[in-house]
A protein has these predicted regions:
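Conserved ABC ATPase signature
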Residues: 146-150, 154
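The feature captures the beta-strand-to-loop junction immediately N-terminal to the Walker
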Residues: 40-42
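Conserved ABC transporter NBD signature motif
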Residues: 63-71
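A short, surface-exposed alpha-helical micro-motif characterized by mixed small hydrophobic
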Residues: 212-214
Length: 349
């Protein structure tokens, strides 16, 4: 298990480094075997910085990250190499992980050189082929190809196949499906689900709440580098307590809901009423189930409600941001129910 305890990262700013910019403040959570943990937040909220600290690509300013009881900041030489045998990362832009001068499958050669120097070439080839097949790739299709000859989805899966050649226990997946097409996204998500079933712990970094809800057992919500809500995914999504979480969830498009025209337009839905949906029966959605504004009478009423809702969220967000700007200490997380924590002092309901 990988544990973050009060982890903070502050970058130096200014011409002579006289200022500091806190990217992550007091983050504490676990990545457990056989679970997907979704790390959700807007761009600039500190998600990727947390991933890079876990992978030792950027140092921790304060706090500790421990893997199987050992502080990873103390690892050097062979110990650090052994850490990377168990903890790997795949990033948003797969092309950045390859040298375009070489063929894409050269990433496997570096693994062999570092971890399996005594394995014969024939045996290593069999291992690589098996790993590629396990992520849905035909070795013949990708072997000896340069990066520009492969798709983003293929390159992502090659990186995952490389990780699987090691005794991997933790995978940091940083926005890994944001640059690939919809059908390939499904393949990668199914692959992550299979890895989870094999006991792998995954940190799924994303700004997409729908994907986080779809794939994860646990969810962490970040705002300005601070964990404002976290816990079991179903509890965070079904019973959001922090204003920021509520605002994010309200903005998430629903696949079974359709918006047509202005707020005043009549909207008809395909599917089932909420009652029929709960019973698993086909039917229709009522207008009020489509959108919180659609069931109201009159355009003025809907617009007034829209303005009121926006003001409510803006006020809550202002409370959160004001607290984070004016307080050096990290707002405490309070357990409001089993495995559901919220930073109450920054705008929780």
């Amino acid at each position: 298990m990988l544990v973050l305890d009060n982890v903070t990262k502050a970058f130096k700013t200014g011409t002579f480094g006289g200022g500091t910019l806190p990217a992550v403040r007091g983050a504490s959570f676990e990545i457990r075997p056989g679970e997907v943990t979704a790390l959700i937040g807007e761009s600039g909220s500190g998600k990727s910085t947390l991933g890079k600290m876990i992978l030792r690509l950027t140092p921790v300013t304060s706090g500790t990250i421990t893997f199987e009881g050992t502080d990873i900041a103390t690892l050097k030489g062979k110990q650090l190499r052994e850490y990377y045998r168990h903890v790997q990362g795949v990033f948003q832009d797969p092309f950045s992980s390859y040298n375009p001068v070489y063929r894409a499958d050269r990433v496997f050669a570096t693994i062999k050189h570092s971890y399996f120097p005594s394995v014969s070439a024939a045996e290593w080839r069999d291992r690589v082929d098996g790993s590629l097949e396990s992520v849905g790739l035909n070795p013949v299709d990708v072997r000896n190809k340069f990066t520009h000859q492969l798709s983003g989805g293929q390159l992502q899966r090659i990186l995952i196949a490389r990780a699987l050649l090691l005794d991997i226990k933790i995978l940091v997946a940083d926005e890994i499906i944001s640059m690939i097409d919809a059908s390939t996204r499904v393949d990668v998500l199914n692959l992550l689900s299979n890895l989870k079933a094999r006991g792998l712990g995954v940190l799924f970094v994303t700004h997409d709440l729908s994907l986080g809800n779809y794939i994860s057992e646990r969810t962490i919500i970040l705002r300005r580098g601070v964990v404002v809500e976290m816990g079991a995914t179903q509890k965070v999504f079904d019973n959001p307590q922090h204003e920021y979480t509520r605002m994010l969830l309200t903005a998430v498009p629903q696949l079974h809901k359709k918006w047509e025209g202005e707020l005043g337009a009549e909207v008809e839905a395909i599917g089932a009423t909420s009652q029929d949906q709960d019973r698993g029966r086909p039917g229709r959605y009522s207008k009020s189930s489509l959108h919180p504004l659609v069931g109201m009478r009159g355009r003025k009423g809907r617009r007034a409600q829209a303005v009121a809702t926006e003001r409510e969220f803006a006020a809550g967000l202002l409370r959160t941001d004001t607290y984070l700007r004016t307080h050096e200490e990290v707002p405490p997380l309070v357990e409001i129910e089993e495995d559901h924590f919220v930073a109450t002092s920054t705008g929780a309901g």
